[in-house]
Amino acid sequence: MKFKNKGLIIILSSPSGTGKSSLAKELLKIDNNLRLSISVTTRKPRLGEVDGINYYFKSDREFKTLVKQNKFLEYAKIYNDYYGTPKEYVKMLLKQGFDVLFDIDWQGVRSIKKNTNNVITIFILPPSIEILEQRLRNRATDNEETIKLRMQSAQNEISHANEYDYVVINDDFSQTLKKIHEIIVAERAKNFAYHEY
């Protein structure tokens, strides 16, 4: 008889510009049992993004076909684009015993928690709204209208932080990374099953 952890779904959410994507990237480097859930999206690729690695980029028509075929664990419209989590890919990783890391918003969290077990949710806050706005401006990837839209959306997203299992303030990147990894390790210790081989 061999002991093995069941795969967990670990969700990171935050307003845009809080460091969530950078934290996810570093978590994947330091934890060999984590795998990233790659979302399907209708948005255009940003500079340096690769189809099948960062996202699966699809047209609106292709995305809607996947919705009709019930291929998503969850999906939502964010800003003017659709994002969805491919169901079979996640199931395969969990079955292999990996923990699957998600980078999704509160709408996706609600949907996944309704349909799936072993879900751990972590909301990442900026130190302040003012610092968040400055981070968005420093990124220099969005125009003024998009920044205003992201700031409005941030207020809405932050209002859902109390729905998460954990809330972490990203005021120091390396400390925030350490806290999130400690949460994951502790949750694994609570979630194991034995399998006969």
From Swiss-Prot:
Residues 7-185 form the Guanylate kinase-like domain. Belongs to the guanylate kinase family. InterPro entries: GK/Ca_channel_bsu, Guanylate_kin-like_dom, Guanylate_kinase, Guanylate_kinase_CS, P-loop_NTPase. ATP binds at residues 14-21. It catalyses: GMP + ATP = GDP + ADP. It comes from the Bacteria. Keywords: ATP-binding, Cytoplasm, Kinase, Nucleotide-binding, Transferase. HAMAP family: Guanylate_kinase (MF_00328). Essential for recycling GMP and indirectly, cGMP. The gene is gmk. It comes from Rickettsia prowazekii (strain Madrid E). The lineage of its organism: Bacteria, Pseudomonadati, Pseudomonadota, Alphaproteobacteria, Rickettsiales. Pfam families: Guanylate_kin. This is Guanylate kinase.
